[in-house]
Amino acid sequence: MFEKQVFLFGVNHKTTPVAVREKIAFTDGYETALTRLQEEVGCDESYLLSTCNRVEILVYADSTRDIEAEVSRFLFAGKVPEEDCRDYLYALKGLPAVQHLFTVAASLDSMVVGEAQILGQLKTAYRHASALGCTGPLLNRLLHKSFSVAKRVRTETAIGASAVSISYAAVQLARKIFGNLDTKKVMLVGAGEMAELAAEHLVGQGVSSVVVANRTLTRAVELADKFGGTAICMEELYAQLEDVDIIISSTGAQHIIIESAEVRPIMRVRRNRPLFFIDIAVPRDLDPELNELENVYLYDIDDLSNVVEVNKSGRDHEAIKAGCIVEEETRKFDEWYQGLAVKPTVLALREKMSGIIEQELRKTLPRLHDLGEHDQRSIEKMVASISSKFLHDPLHYLKSDSCHGRDKSQAKVDTLRSVFSLKGDI
């Protein structure tokens, strides 16, 4: 009987506030995190996904181990009180874990249902895990299946038609506060994927002045040129606050980028013209105390959920269709997985029958001197056909729907191995 199982553990925007998520975000990169995961948990196969809205760990391991406790220690690493960890962490095993992964890949569990970023994030995480040898046959199959599920959902539903990214939700929030953005000056802090998406949406909304601040000036210039904007280094950031109206920050820094104490005197220079900050980074880039300054408005990634709700109703119908696809593909994967339990017995039964046929043919054919080669081949085909028909019922018995479930599979495997005297490990 299979003693290994698929487990999925995680925290996301639904279970855990950003103040906690930023403490456990793997800002040092996948290589460091995956190496730690292998050292501290040590599973047969493992995979880790870390985004602004979720951290999820997928493992294939011995089902008798207390994997949840081990993963919890790895994930929270003493940064969160132990009694709170249980409230934040979700733990799934077997089929529910598979269905959750497919749901995430299909963007049905995203803050913005239907957004396209999550699939790319899943694939990036997989490339790192695969390159480090963390994944194996089971997780490779499962993760590739999740990619195909996401593609099928995109193809067969309009889930992405009215979807917006987190970056676009930030732009929508800016419009809500300022109205027309044509005359507004915007500064992007960070030049990564989120910043680029924000720039695309801002230009689409009529913004004509974009400033990009980044630690790597070359990347800032590259992004600014793409949108007809201006690039600056991070040291010029505070000086630019005197002129801009909207700041969208999405760096990968592990510390606060813009401090409240530094902005206070700038507001006097601005004569208290409104300054709007949107922090879509995890860990957060912007000092939470900015909200205490007069005419300064700060929104973090969790606040964006209110903007996201505007488009939610238009996606509900397509989300139902997408959910049906996820359920169907989950069942298909389960059928394949259940088949792994009976496959060794199927092979053993066929090998035993083939061995019997070969043995009997070797004994019988030499005695039939009068038979020509054609007749001998006919006898061999006839015996093979009889064998195939004889095996049909027991093999069907093993693979039938009534065999689903590991306990039922194992009971039928044990029965057939006993009846046919099949030996060896399964």
Swiss-Prot record:
Its EC number is 1.2.1.70. It comes from the Bacteria. GO terms for biological process: protoporphyrinogen IX biosynthetic process from glutamate. Substrate binds at residues 51-54, 110, 115-117, 121. The active site is at 52 (nucleophile). GO terms for molecular function: glutamyl-tRNA reductase activity; NADP binding. InterPro entries: 4pyrrol_synth_GluRdtase, 4pyrrol_synth_GluRdtase_dimer, 4pyrrol_synth_GluRdtase_N, GluRdtase_CS, GluRdtase_dimer_dom_sf, GluRdtase_N_sf, NAD(P)-bd_dom_sf, Shikm_DH/Glu-tRNA_Rdtase. It catalyses: (S)-4-amino-5-oxopentanoate + tRNA(Glu) + NADP(+) = L-glutamyl-tRNA(Glu) + NADPH + H(+). NADP(+) binds at residues 190-195. Catalyzes the NADPH-dependent reduction of glutamyl-tRNA(Glu) to glutamate 1-semialdehyde (GSA). Belongs to the glutamyl-tRNA reductase family. During catalysis, the active site Cys acts as a nucleophile attacking the alpha-carbonyl group of tRNA-bound glutamate with the formation of a thioester intermediate between enzyme and glutamate, and the concomitant release of tRNA(Glu). The thioester intermediate is finally reduced by direct hydride transfer from NADPH, to form the product GSA. Homodimer. Possesses an unusual extended V-shaped dimeric structure with each monomer consisting of three distinct domains arranged along a curved 'spinal' alpha-helix. The N-terminal catalytic domain specifically recognizes the glutamate moiety of the substrate. The second domain is the NADPH-binding domain, and the third C-terminal domain is responsible for dimerization. This is Glutamyl-tRNA reductase. It comes from Desulfotalea psychrophila (strain LSv54 / DSM 12343). The gene is hemA.
